[in-house]
Amino acid sequence: MPETYWGKAREFLSKHNLDVGDIIELEKNGIQVKGIIMPTYSNNDDIIVLKLDNGYNIGISVSNIQNVKLIEKKRKEEKRREGAVSTTNSEVMIISTGGTIVSKIEYETGAVRPALTPDEIIEFMPEIKEIARIDAEILFSILSENMKPEYWIKIAEEAKKALDKGNKGVVIAHGTDTMAYTSAALSFSFRKMTGPIVLVGSQRSSDRPSSDSSMNLLTSILVAKNAPFGEVVVNMHGESSDTYTLVHRGVKVRKMHTSRRDAFQSINDLPLAKVHYIDKKIEILSDNYRSKESENTLDAKFDNRVFLLKYYPGLSPDMVEHLISSGIRGIIIEGTGLGHTSSDFYEVFKKASKDGVFIGMTSQCLFGRVNMNVYTTGRLLQEAGVVPLEDMLPETALVKLMWTLAHENDLDRIKEIMLTNLAGEINYIHHYEMFPRWYHDRIRLQ
């Protein structure tokens, strides 16, 4: 049964006894098309997806198809177990949580699945053998938008097990959309680490010529084995070409583009390292990193009764009051500029603070730090109990608050922890180089 299809497309495939992985030939509008039926993620219920011989996928409406012929039924997939694949004396453990970074497309069956075994990963990228002995595990296979705090805990526990077994580092394959949330969660959860935990993803799927999968994975393994720091980091393309990746601190990184391969950038911080793909060398860019420890200490728990509030002109205090009455324990505000909302929120925030709700302020600008002492509105909001959170990214502040609330109930103690630099999330000194200047009069658009 074509499980990924629905509506008219599903009816068409069922009528002709076709399934994902079958090779078919069909005729429409006098044109014959041959290909493998692939899974679909389209919202259109009358489209089927075929993988052509040239490797490209096309979508075809099932309406008015004149003829369809089965060329070959799909080949049965070999049964594969999920879980750890035992490799003695591994140096780097690869933990897959989803995404396309280590996915393998089986054109014989139309299936897309994670590359499970170390042998498959090495087949995917033989150069790995020259870098490290690896082990691999599928923890779960989910889209990153479906990531949850309880999954962060499982990832942290598996990463600790891998480090405790003697691996020099851990690579976590993760979808890119929520990778920064997970990297922040792991950063706060690990108090001590014997080696790096490297989150890596892919902006382009592994079946595309422009895929960044291979380079990102290989350089991440290099970082996990050889980097001198004991931190949670994100390693992704540093530019649009295939020359180097950048290693970002897990609490100071953000996805800043929807599709570019170099979408991830350090915000209010410099990358920790630059990894040269051709030379397979790590260039340390900052000595301000957490050193490796002799043991791994994990404290992973989160309270998700929080809310990330983006202020905008016209936001009603009544809406925020209703939100607070829902039982949340904390709010992170993305305020304007130096950290502002309308002064109309003074009474709402004051009451919430008295009721024990933590309210922290970050900036929509992302770059720079909040300073609520400059203007009257900022000073009033502080009087109401709003806490300025330095140069923390909104998403990082949200995850930190979830971690803090799981450990403390006293509001004063919560404020104290939120203003304590636990994992490098607060940078007290900003340099000129930390702000990217995207335009220097060098490009003239025609």
From Swiss-Prot:
Reaction(s) the record says it catalyses: L-glutamyl-tRNA(Gln) + L-glutamine + ATP + H2O = L-glutaminyl-tRNA(Gln) + L-glutamate + ADP + phosphate + H(+)
Q: What class of enzyme is it?
A: ligase
Q: What one GO molecular function would you report for this record?
A: asparaginase activity
> SUPFAM superfamilies recorded for this chain?
GatD N-terminal domain-like, Glutaminase/Asparaginase
The residue ranges of the Asparaginase/glutaminase domain are 90-421
Record-linked Pfam families: Asparaginase, Asparaginase_C, GatD_N
Catalytic center residues: T100, T176, D177, K255
What biological process terms from GO does the record include? amino acid metabolic process; regulation of translational fidelity; translation
Q: Which SMART domains match?
A: Asparaginase
Q: Which UniProt keywords apply?
A: ATP-binding, Ligase, Nucleotide-binding, Protein biosynthesis
| InterPro entries named in the record | AsnA_fam, Asp/glu_Ase-like_sf, Asparaginase/glutaminase-like, Asparaginase/glutaminase_AS2, Asparaginase_C, GatD, GatD_N, GatD_N_sf
* EC number, as in UniProt: 6.3.5.-
Q: How does it assemble?
A: Heterodimer of GatD and GatE.
Q: What is its biological role?
A: Allows the formation of correctly charged Gln-tRNA(Gln) through the transamidation of misacylated Glu-tRNA(Gln) in organisms which lack glutaminyl-tRNA synthetase. The reaction takes place in the presence of glutamine and ATP through an activated gamma-phospho-Glu-tRNA(Gln). The GatDE system is specific for glutamate and does not act on aspartate.
UniProt similarity note: Belongs to the asparaginase 1 family. GatD subfamily.
Task: Please give the name of this protein.
Answer: Glutamyl-tRNA(Gln) amidotransferase subunit D
The opening ranks of the lineage are:
Archaea, Thermoproteota, Thermoprotei, Sulfolobales, Sulfolobaceae
